[in-house]
């Protein structure tokens, strides 16, 4: 059943599991649990189609390094409905899967390990524990053989040269038609008698029992003034990387510091992936012949990514990173490419620091602008490769001073809006500074070509973000170190869980969706085990007896 809160005239029945948020993780949880017979209540703030008033409830303020505003005319936006362009999180049935670009990538093994040079690193679960759930998700969504993904990047023509130079080549699978969770599962959810989907219902407060151990009710409100108190044995927050912390902090009537915040960690350790497109790769003859390996169209395809090997990262005490490269053909670009890219990224990130007057003058020349417009119009033609445009994605080190907190401004439902204080640490800056020279040398040794970071000093002040919101309710072995335990259960509670990238202790530089999906499947298995055995036996991986 799918209904709007405003249309519900009777009390909503008690559920086995209430899932707040109907995006990638929330819908997957509801489907998996519903198929096994659990009574599931799926609660979504948005409606079945895009509603600007509901979207406005997701507003936040930047008080630290600003999160960038996406380019509405960027290369991944034209296929989207115009209402979505420039949005990074969608309040609608289907969540942000509605605008997702379809990129799947595994986290590397080093991410899960405690690295002595990265304070706060290490996961309380292993990569091996999560891989069976990755495989299950990959099977269901046509991603291919998960076991082959780690080695798949080692079969290109320059693979041996890259390995010898200390460069790892990895794969990012890019779907031709990105998975839209609402489109795929709407009919199945509507037909399940044991699943109720409630739209237009924003969770504004979690009410605990007298012992402050269990969530007794989830208070939801609609923009039309309707209010309901919903109950379930187990409650899961699947509301993206920002909203779980907001709801925990806002639920402060019984616990002044908010739920799960006994150690003041809710909202702290917020991370994103700093990203820059300033570097240009002038390809070697061998790399020119690999243009079809590296082009980003047609889709689907497994896109190659380059980066220093895990051994080199450990040796040089670096944070993780990945370099994607795209062939730019000579008809596209015969003007000062690095200058135009530098100015474009600076404007997008609202910072002109690091740009010289000469760079600005070259980029603003009339001939340069005419040629830039021309290459945008004719971007899909083929010809001789002039160079490779790059995007460098960087891991952010865990940093307790990088945080989310409640601001003074309130939304239309009376909830305090988030303030995002995104802060990069000295380790982030030092790692990126060393990385540029090491990458340049390694690319040359591998025969890939000359990596040019431009004439101006490139720092993280010039970098934007990747819209990957990570870490604000981090997973840990102890409540003194995080907000949720290894089963994604909020410390200090018995029945409250979080299933978003906000539980990642670290997120390397990979797109987070694949890992979010795997964690949601793992949580499904845990909740099913709770139903089958009140003593909560050890978590079973798919296929285990």
Q: How would you name each of these model-derived features?
A:
Residues 76, 80, 103, 116-210, ...:
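Conserved redox-cofactor binding core of oxidoreductases
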Residues 198-211, 374-403, 413-507, 513:
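A glycine-rich dinucleotide-binding beta-alpha-beta segment and adjacent secondary-structure elements
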């Amino acid at each position: 059943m799918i209904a709007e809160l405003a249309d519900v005239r009777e009390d909503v029945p008690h559920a086995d599991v209430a899932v707040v948020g109907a995006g990638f993780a929330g819908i997957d949880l509801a489907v998996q649990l519903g198929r096994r017979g659990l009574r599931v209540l799926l609660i979504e703030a948005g409606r079945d189609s895009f509603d600007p008033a509901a979207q406005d409830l997701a507003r936040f303020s930047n008080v630290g390094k600003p999160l960038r505003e996406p380019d509405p005319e960027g290369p991944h936006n034209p296929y989207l409905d115009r209402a979505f362009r420039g949005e990074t999180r969608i309040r609608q049935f289907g969540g942000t899967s509605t605008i997702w670009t379809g990129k799947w990538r595994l986290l590397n093994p080093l991410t899960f390990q405690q690295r002595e040079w990265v304070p706060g690193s290490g996961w309380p679960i292993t990569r091996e524990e999560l891989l069976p759930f990755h495989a299950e998700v990959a099977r269901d969504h046509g991603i291919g053989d998960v076991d082959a993904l780690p080695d798949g990047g080692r079969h290109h023509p320059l693979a041996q040269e890259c390995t010898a130079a200390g460069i790892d080549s990895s794969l990012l699978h890019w779907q031709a038609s990105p998975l839209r969770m609402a489109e795929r599962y709407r009919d199945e959810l509507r037909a399940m008698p044991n699943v109720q989907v409630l739209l237009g219902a924003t969770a504004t407060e979690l009410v605990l029992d007298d012992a402050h151990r269990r969530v007794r009710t989830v208070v939801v409100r609609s923009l039309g003034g309707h209010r309901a108190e919903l109950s379930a044995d187990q409650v899961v927050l699947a509301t993206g990387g920002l909203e779980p912390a907001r709801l925990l902090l806002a639920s402060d009537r019984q616990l002044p510091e908010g739920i799960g915040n006994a150690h003041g960690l809710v909202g702290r350790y917020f991370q994103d992936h700093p990203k820059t497109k300033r570097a240009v790769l002038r390809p070697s003859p061998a790399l020119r012949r690999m243009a079809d390996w590296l082009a980003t169209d047609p889709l689907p395809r497994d896109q190659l990514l380059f980066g220093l090997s895990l051994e080199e990262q450990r040796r040089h005490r670096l944070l993780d990173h990945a370099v994607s490269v795209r062939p730019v053909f000579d008809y596209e670009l015969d003007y000062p490419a690095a200058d135009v890219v530098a100015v474009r990224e600076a404007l997008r990130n609202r910072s002109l620091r690091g740009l010289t007057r000469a760079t600005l003058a070259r980029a603003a020349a009339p001939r340069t602008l005419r040629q830039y417009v021309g290459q945008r119009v004719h971007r899909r033609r083929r010809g001789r490769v002039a160079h490779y445009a790059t995007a460098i994605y960087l891991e952010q080190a865990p940093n307790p001073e990088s945080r989310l907190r409640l601001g003074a401004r309130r939304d239309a439902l009376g909830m305090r809006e988030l303030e995002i204080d995104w802060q990069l640490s000295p380790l982030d800056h030092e790692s990126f500074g060393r990385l540029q020279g090491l990458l340049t040398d390694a690319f040359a040794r591998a025969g890939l070509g000359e990596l040019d970071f431009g004439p101006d000093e490139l720092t993280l002040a010039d970098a934007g973000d990747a819209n990957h919101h990570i870490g604000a309710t981090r997973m840990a072995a102890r409540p003194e170190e995080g907000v949720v335990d290894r089963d994604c259960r909020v410390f200090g509670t018995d029945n409250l869980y979080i299933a978003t990238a906000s539980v990642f202790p670290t997120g390397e530089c990979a797109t987070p969706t694949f890992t979010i999906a795997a964690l949601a499947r793992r949580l499904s298995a845990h909740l099913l085990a709770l139903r089958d055995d009140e003593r909560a036996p050890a978590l079973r991986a798919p296929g285990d007896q």
